[in-house]
Every structure is written in structure tokens, then in C-alpha cells.
Amino acid sequence: MIEYIRGELAALTPAQAVIEAAGVGYALGISLNTYTVLQGKREVKLYVHEAIVTGGRDDSYTLYGFATVQERALYRLLITVSGVGANTARMILSSITPKELCNIIAGGDERMLKSVKGIGVRTAQRIIVDLKDKIVASGIADELRAVSKPGTPAVDTTVRDEAVSALTMLGFSPAPSAKVVQSILTEQPTLPVEQVVKQALKLIK
């Protein structure tokens, strides 16, 4: 399983990014949100979702890339909803920022979801009903609020990602791990990875 790809941005369009890493060019489908983040950058890192389809006439293997773990987590939640496929989920994340999407689902705002191309009344309702509690339980909304809170010291994303990865390898779930790590780094943004992990082990449940 590919967790993320880091390398040189070889090509970029609003729908796709090509990253060259260790001599291999990886083509990843992206949202407009991720496209905006990548513009003007040379060295990039994208969190990966692998979509493998088998059993039909044409098997397929597609990579999707996301600028943040939160956007990827939302994508993975969206594709669990009946009627929301890979392209529809990407369209939603191209039309609405991750933070806005969390607020829309939490507030039950069907109208805003219906403004996305391809989303009708029933699909909008299913997204809200199916994901409202899951988003709260996952901690995604809390992470996004912490990242965007005015006056919050900048968090070293490399330290954050490595700490979350370490906790995941130790057997903890990614969502609560990310929430605890984000909380620690918001309060102490200069902590090294090993100290973040040690503190997280005392706090994570």
C-alpha cells in the first residue's frame, strides 16, 4: 500500500499531477483544492489513495493524490456513500474545501451539496446522513479547525506526518492519532518527532 509519494512535480493540470520519485513518474488524479496547493511548487508530497477495480472486463489501478491527510480522509468517507463514486467525490472536493465540506455536512446543508455538479437531493441527503457522525468520530473537523485557527503557530507537517505514521505502525488508528498529534504540535510546534510520539502515547486512547 502506498501512503504518500514525495518527489519532483513533473506535470500538473487541474485534474492530474505527475510526480517523479526515484526515476518513476506517478500519475495521480487530484482535486482542484490540491491543484491550487501544488501550483508553483517543484518538490511536492501527496497522500495517496489506491483504487483497484477487478472482476470486470477491464481491471484498473488508479492513484489519487491529496495535499492533506484530511482531504484524503474525506474522500475515503465520501466514496462509502451509495451513489458517490470516485469522480463524484473528486468533484465535491474540487467544488468545496475540506473545511467547508465538514461544516456543510455538520449543518445538514443540502442546498450547498446540491450546488455541486452531479449531486441531487437524494445523494445530498445520503451524504449528510451517512457521514455526519463519522466525520465527528474521525476528528477530521477538529484537525481542520486547528490547522486554520488564526494565530495558531505553524505546525511542521513533516514532524506531524512522521509522528502519525509511527503511531499507526504501533497499532493506533490514524484518525485519533492525527488528532492527538495535531493537538500536541499546536501547543508545542517545535517538538521533535520522538517527543511528540512519547507525549501522544500518554494521551491517545
Annotate each language-model stretch with its function.
Residues 89, 101, 124, 177-181, ...:
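Small-residue helix-packing motif on alpha-helices
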Residues 1-5:
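Short coil-to-beta-strand transition motifs
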Residues 11-111, 127, 137, 144, ...:
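Long, highly charged, low-complexity intrinsically disordered interaction regions
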Residues 119-137:
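Alpha-helical interaction/regulatory segments in DNA maintenance proteins
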Residues 73-77, 88, 109-112, 159-166, ...:
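A general alpha-helix detector
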Residues 140-142, 146-205:
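Low-complexity, acidic/Ser/Thr- and charged residue-rich accessory regions of DNA metabolism proteins
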Residues 7-9:
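Conserved hydrophobic positions within beta-strands
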